[in-house]
Amino acid sequence: MAKKSVIQRNINRLKLINKYSAQREAIKNEIKRTSKVEKKISLYSNISRLPRDSSKVRLRSRCWVTGRGRSVYKNFGLSRHMFRFMASNGLLPGVVKSSW
């Protein structure tokens, strides 16, 4: 299990991402449309004034059962350990162990 504080930090980042996503996208689109260098520099400084945690890159995909941050399958939201456990116990519908 991951520490509760680490999981909570990720949740807080998700809230910030949702809060500032429209503002961040508007600035990015303006940067793409602008050809003047001075204007682009000022727009980049506007992006840098936004909170760091409002960037999507800082969000970590975590297992919804254990909170593990590494080796998480996006389609299921599970770490490899929980995926194997749940699939072998038949808790994931449609997942079948392959054999050939």
From Swiss-Prot:
Keywords: Chloroplast, Plastid, Ribonucleoprotein, Ribosomal protein, RNA-binding, rRNA-binding. Its main location: plastid. Pfam families: Ribosomal_S14. InterPro entries: Ribosomal_uS14 (IPR001209), Ribosomal_uS14_bac/plastid (IPR023036), Ribosomal_uS14_CS (IPR018271). SUPFAM superfamilies: Glucocorticoid receptor-like (DNA-binding domain). Disulfide bonds: none annotated. GO terms for biological process: translation. PROSITE patterns: RIBOSOMAL_S14. GO terms for molecular function: rRNA binding; structural constituent of ribosome. GO terms for cellular component: chloroplast; small ribosomal subunit. It is found in: Plastid, Chloroplast. Belongs to the universal ribosomal protein uS14 family. Binds 16S rRNA, required for the assembly of 30S particles. PANTHER family: 30S RIBOSOMAL PROTEIN S14, SMALL RIBOSOMAL SUBUNIT PROTEIN US14M. Part of the 30S ribosomal subunit. This is Small ribosomal subunit protein uS14c. It comes from Cyanidium caldarium (Red alga). The gene is rps14.
